[in-house]
Amino acid sequence: MARTKLYMRIVAQRVTHASVTIDGKVKSKIGLGMLVLLGIEEADNEEDIEWLCQKLTKLRIFSDENDAMNLDVNQVEGSFLVVSQFTLHALTKKGNRPSFIRAARPEQAIPLYEQFLKRLAEVSGREVQSGEFGTMMAVELLNDGPVTIIMDSKNRE
């Protein structure tokens, strides 16, 4: 049986503000910037992290003075809020209950998640806030546009 190809997956949303609340307390929040939902798959590695961090930092999804998406997160002095989300790797081909078998197990995913946060801060030079890995969170955001971009680390188009 052929294996479905899934890799580190990101959903990046341009936001005017976003926050993560855990047990009724705000853990982290940002103003203008990007909310990044990060799904880590079993085949992911440091190369995937590097490519995605470089891409996110240079992604021109913010409006310039002519309302054209022409500016990156640095040019608008924005921030990142990164939230781990294994459900981005849901397999829904069979039945009605999603399978998450391809999502990386916590012992592999946590170090990669932490490395992603560190590397994104290094590459971007911007503030990087985060959710809490493996915890039920309430994520609140005001999607600006809306602008929502999906990227897979092995599908580098």
Task: Name what the model sees in each region.
Residues M1-Y7:
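N-terminal amphipathic/basic-hydrophobic helices that include classical n-h-c signal peptides
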Residues Q13, G39, S84, E140, ...:
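Short beta-strand segments
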Residues K25-E77, T87-K118, V123:
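Compact, glycine-rich, soluble single-domain proteins
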Residues L52, V83, V147:
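Residue-level signal for inorganic ion chemistry
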Residues E65-F80, Q129-L141:
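Glycine/charge-rich, flexible interdomain linkers and switch-proximal surface loops
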Residues F100-E157:
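Positively charged, low-complexity, intrinsically disordered RNA-binding extensions
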